[in-house]
């Protein structure tokens, strides 16, 4: 079972992601802030992180930069309510980008794609 870290300041989004992604067979751990996410990262190993770009008084990009430095092997998907960032995610060294919506099909597909790619790297 893959462990996912979901970082979003909106409680309803964290709940939605937890419910939907748990149904897909993932273990989902959530955090509402960079501080909380950092604590969760110190407590365990994660296979992938899903980060909201705009957190309350913080930026998911800051956490992404921290993850790139400290956990360069952990894939990260950025999420935003705005599609304008879609062309920038690779420059930020993220592995994927998803526009937030009530339908999590795109997010689920992106998670599956990235985790399959990660497994493929390990088996080569």
What residue spans do the PLM features occupy?
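Active-site residues of response regulator receiver
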Residues: 52
């Amino acid at each position: 079972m893959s462990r996912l870290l979901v970082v979003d300041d909106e409680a309803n989004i964290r709940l939605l992601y937890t419910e939907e992604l748990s149904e897909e067979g993932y273990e989902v751990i959530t955090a509402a802030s960079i501080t909380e996410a950092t604590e969760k990262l110190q407590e365990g190993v994660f296979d992938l992180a899903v980060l909201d770009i705009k957190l309350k008084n913080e930026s998911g990009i800051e956490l992404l930069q921290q993850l790139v430095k400290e956990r360069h092997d952990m894939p990260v998907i950025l999420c935003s309510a705005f599609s304008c960032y879609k062309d920038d995610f690779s420059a930020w060294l993220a592995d994927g980008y998803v526009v937030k919506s009530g339908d999590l099909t795109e997010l689920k597909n992106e998670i599956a794609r990235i985790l399959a790619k990660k497994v493929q790297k390990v088996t080569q």
